Regions:
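Catalytic-core segments of class I nucleotidyltransferases/pyrophosphorylases
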Residues: 1-57
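Residue-level recognition of oxygen-bearing side chains
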Residues: 15, 48, 84, 230, ...
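Short coil/turn connectors at secondary-structure junctions
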Residues: 26-28, 37, 86, 189, ...
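Long, charged amphipathic helices and adjacent flexible linkers at domain junctions
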Residues: 53-82
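Phosphate-binding active sites in nucleotide-utilizing proteins
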Residues: 77-118, 122-123, 129
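Glycine-rich hexapeptide-repeat left-handed beta-helix
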Residues: 117-261
Length: 261
């Protein structure tokens, strides 16, 4: 019947209600079905579209809560049909989860998060974060005001803290980027600490370059790591340094002028 709908009316639109007449003309029986108003909402303008979207949002949230997901304020949570949530996930207010995102049990999301195509492993915490195409490992801690871009992987127990942006970067288990840093095109080993205001300088104006930082490294605050670069295991960089050459394992690199008073 749907393929026989015409537009010969004053609005020039296809009317779904015309299906009843078409079915009867084809010899089919037509009977009444009792349903809710929500199931037969019409969408003719943006206001009605928003109402239909809100009804679907509420239905999806109800289904997940019945499956064991905790939502502190479900009226502020938006979850795509394509999202996978385990039981025992906790979602705080003002959270949007979309695309192929997967949230594993024990994870805490929110408040104020937007996650798209993001995997959050068991018992991880994500606060006030925008994440696109990232993988957040078990027990990892993200936020607040963190931006995870495609290709970002956080290992188990890793931390990406306040005002941190990461792109195409692999942060090893128990490594930390606590605050105010940009990490782009990088691989970082386990147990490494990236000091505040560190920048991975990955772009030379034409191409992006990779930085490799080993395990148990200490990057001093306000360090500029100019890629391509390799920093060995257990190395240190002094605060305020501009590092342009590889740093051997266990070494201390200082790339700044001496203070003069």
């Amino acid at each position: 019947a749907l393929e026989n709908l015409a537009t010969d009316n004053s609005q020039g639109e296809q009317y779904l209600t015309d299906v009843l007449g078409i079915l009867r003309s084809q010899g089919h029986s037509v009977t009444a079905v009792v349903t809710t108003e929500e199931n037969i909402l019409g969408v003719n303008d943006r206001r009605q579209l928003a109402a239909a979207g809100a009804a679907l949002r509420s239905r999806i949230c109800d289904e997940w809560m019945l499956a064991g997901v905790t939502m502190v304020d479900p009226t502020t949570v938006w979850i795509d049909r394509t999202v996978e949530l385990d039981a025992e996930v906790t979602i705080l207010p003002n959270v949007t989860i979309s695309g192929a995102s997967k949230i594993r049990n024990g994870a805490n999301i929110g408040p104020d998060c937007s996650l798209h195509d993001t995997v959050v492993d068991h018992c991880a915490t994500v606060i006030r974060t925008t994440s696109i195409g990232a993988i957040i490992g078990e027990g990892a801690n993200v936020g607040p005001y963190t931006y995870l871009r495609p290709g970002t992987v956080l290992g188990a127990g890793a931390k990406a803290g306040g005002f941190v942006e990461m792109k195409n970067a692999n942060l090893g288990p128990n490594s930390k980027v606590p605050h105010l840093s940009y990490v782009g095109d990088a691989t970082i080993g386990e147990g490494t600490n990236i000091g505040a205001a560190t920048v991975f300088v990955n772009y030379d104006g034409q191409e992006k370059h990779h930085t490799q930082v080993g395990s148990y490294v200490r990057i001093g605050s306000d360090t500029m790591l100019v890629a391509p670069l390799v920093i060995g295991d257990g190395a240190y960089t002094a605060a305020g340094s501009v590092i342009t050459e590889d740093v051997p394992a266990g070494s201390m690199a200082v790339g700044r002028a001496r203070q003069r008073n």
